[in-house]
């Protein structure tokens, strides 16, 4: 109550208490009401008068408090941007229609299937069968990487291609087993079985598919796919390359025939042990090395011949695509000839029994304990699923000129893995190699996945007897050949270094950690380093003080046109010494921030501005502290000048700062507080009011934030009626030619048309040439054309400008040349500009 009394006495007048009832009468009235309880109606009426008076008093007092501290009214802020408007625009506007659109977007097949062209069917059929011939040997090979029986790779292959087409926004992506995810699955199986050996490898892999698929689907449904963008390309390339090296080294023992003798886990140890056991090489190496040579030879020869003989390019492409299937078929035939009489003890390592059909269809075994054991393994699994699929989908969408919907792609991948658990499939994601084959085969729509699924089913029901004799060494050769495409080429590595050395370091560190520690650590390190680099860039933004140069377009040797003023960083002169950069007017500074102005960088930016300005301006008072005892501890003692000293500080006094917000997309509370602190600090330093001007503001919310903090207009004063306002003045119902637009460049004099001397327009000088498009708009019997004013910025906030040039002109006019300010007059809203024709 004491606080309210102080506020009332400071900001209220006695007239505030005379509305409805006199303030001094209230105690008597309350005594009267206490003694006369019978007259209840009179009590109610007088009490209402009392409350009305109190409400009026409170409201007026609050208004005076806001005026005293220059706090804008809520209505004034809502004109710039308001929460109800945003909520109405983004949430409540057509909410039912948006909900239906959301449900429809979950099934993109509804959009493109009715428009399916029958002529596309042959392309989809060829692409589907081609991918099917590749996915069968790859699926069985990747199941080996995941330490699962071969049939589980086929189960994942079938579900991936069959389900994805109903939810896909990419026609090229092929979902199924991939090398990196298979390796992660193997790591997860090993870690969980080390905790509890009661679970089998397929049970663990299926539960992992359930949890990872549910998380991925949830991210897509909630439209949170943008979080993937926080991981840059070098980080993805780093752990992908590390994973490829891990897979490649892990398949060498099986390729050479001494798989059981290499037990190391880290990549570098696997390489060392593989080299130590080279004397233990068996006959399997003949199958593996020959197959590997044929695969690489066929690949490079088909690529070379396809370029050399473009006429036969399609035939070479088909040969190159089917090379893995042909190698597996030929190798299996040779293996059958060798092992058919030695089924119980084959001389080479073969796959042996592969169950026919879908032997494990049903509800999987999922327990709480298994889910708890898998919890720590989920982050890395989800990251790999997300990054591999989205990066592949985006790259093929960019190459083939269509756009994907990342969130819908996550839903498609999540649903595919969720349905796959009923077939005992392990986690699947987009495959780069199979997607590339699918795209080159001329696929037209996602329906090609149905034909790929048919090939997988055919192999499961008709070819399982033949799968018995597939040599493991050949499957290892197929894996090694496939993962070499995941290793980043040297050319791309050098490009990373040339573009961004810091991001290239992330790539190298990720590869090193993956090789010498583990794939999981490599992924975590790359993601953490990418996040640290992002925060570092936000916390240490690049800011520049600007100067002016005159730019023009030069045509030929003599023709120069479109001369204009542009503002560039002052440090550009160091890069180009011949460039003449004109500094802003004395006491005026122009600062451009190249990042959003938020709490991580607020302190650094304010320090940068304060130091630069204090270095280039002088204090308003030489010694603001009369006595040394009043000097703060952090302010150095000023030396007394000698009496005969003629040294004078010629630096200007600080007058204004112009902030170029063209690159600022966000402005938070901490940043605004730093602006307030800078203004306070610099006003103490300059011993006068320092104007803060803002240009190129991109968002109404940024304007609202600045206005709420007291920026946008002169501090402590009402807005002058003669303030300069940027306007656009188009011809009514006409399009000016470029020549006539240039003829409107010089203002001769303002036109005053009211008693207060306000300006409603200006007379422009014309050269009398090429003005036919102006003359046709002259009124009959007159030589004048009226042009309407359209204001760019609000008259309420004269310190908000459309660009830097207009802010500088305004400051030159009002601060540096105050005697000229009357010539500008004021601009009436809805006024007109008059153009006077001057004949030759």
Curated annotation (Swiss-Prot):
Top-level taxonomic group: Eukaryota
Main location (coarse class): membrane
Alphabetized GO MF terms: sulfate transmembrane transporter activity
Cellular location(s): Membrane
Disulfide bridges in this chain: none
Function statement: High affinity uptake of sulfate into the cell.
Protein name, entry field: Probable sulfate permease C869.05c
Record organism: Schizosaccharomyces pombe (strain 972 / ATCC 24843) (Fission yeast)
